[in-house]
Amino acid sequence: MFKELEEINSRPAPFQFYTAKELWTDEHTAKKMLEYHLNESLDLSSRNKDFIDRSLKWIVSHFGIGVNTIIADFGCGPGLYTTQFAEKNADVTGIDFSERSIRYAKETATRKGLNIDYVCQNYLEFETEKRVDLITMIMCDFCALSPTQRKKMLTGFYRLLNAGGSVLLDVYSLNAFDQREEV
């Protein structure tokens, strides 16, 4: 009995459990996550509005986003970036696990008259014949993946990219990890 309790209370190894499905598809959790995405002053599910505005300005300028740019945004959430890419006349696909966030993103696109292809799916399983110029994965999603999942994502990205295409990953620096203390 003590051995079982010890096992139950032991710290799991990094990436021992993959809980994305539970996190993004549970109705209560998904509702709160969407609220956090849409709160413009917090850096929880999405960056704060000022950061998003500054980063979008840089992304659009740096990658020359416009009429013929094809973009896939992995972990797009409620479309905070995809909407603005589409407003620059880019051809945009957003992929996210959360049905609630995808529904919100689709409603926003419809209301604004934007043609954005939203896919509600675990982005680790996303496949398409379409090739893209830019892949984005914003808000440190890449950091949450195991080394095996990261390799799978990068391999998938390679297959999706047009010649000369780019990948933009928003990741924590090693310095940011050093400043955190696990409790």
Model-derived features: positions:
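Conserved SAM-binding loop of SAM-dependent methyltransferases across substrates and taxa
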Residues: 78-89
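Conserved SAM-binding strand-loop segment of SAM-dependent methyltransferases
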Residues: 111-125
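A short glycine-rich, Lys/Arg-flanked "PGG" loop and its adjoining helix->strand segment in the class I
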Residues: 151-163
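Conserved class I S-adenosyl-L-methionine
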Residues: 168-183
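N-terminal auxiliary segments of SAM/dcSAM-dependent transferases
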Residues: 1-24
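Conserved SAM/SAH-binding beta-strand->alpha-helix loop
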Residues: 98-100
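Conserved SAM-binding loop and adjacent beta-strand
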Residues: 24, 28, 40-57
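A short acidic, Gly/Pro-enriched loop at the edge of an enzyme's catalytic core
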Residues: 127-134
